[in-house]
Amino acid sequence: MFNEEEYKSVTFVVRGTSMNPFLVSGRDKVILAPPRTPKIGDVVLAEFKERVYALHRVIDFKNGTYTMRGDGNPLSMTEQFTEEKIVGIAEAFIRKGKRVDITSPKWRLYSSTWKALRPFRRILLAIYRRIIVKILP
């Protein structure tokens, strides 16, 4: 869709709840770098159906097909895409007005912790959605 000659990076506001609790719709922003071959754990913007896009984390790669899932989505909710469908790869996020690079220790800690909490995510997300979202606007 885009290539390096067309842009260096692009920033947009996150919409939707699939990357909750760490990226909040309407508040946080993502800074995308041009497409490249993604690694497991990268957050990518990809077209997974015709004209349907998602900003999710790459969780698997098999036989030329990538699988991605939103951090706030159930474990069974995934999307598949091929490399040519990648629009961009996150290089940073702006959370609560502060830039967080994906190479920063803070982001790496978040990513590894969230991966380790996989068996407990459903409970943690339920608590987040039912309690924290109602308390904090």
Question: How would you label these PLM feature ranges?
Answer:
Residues 1-137:
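Extended hydrophobic leader/signal-anchor segments used for secretion and membrane insertion
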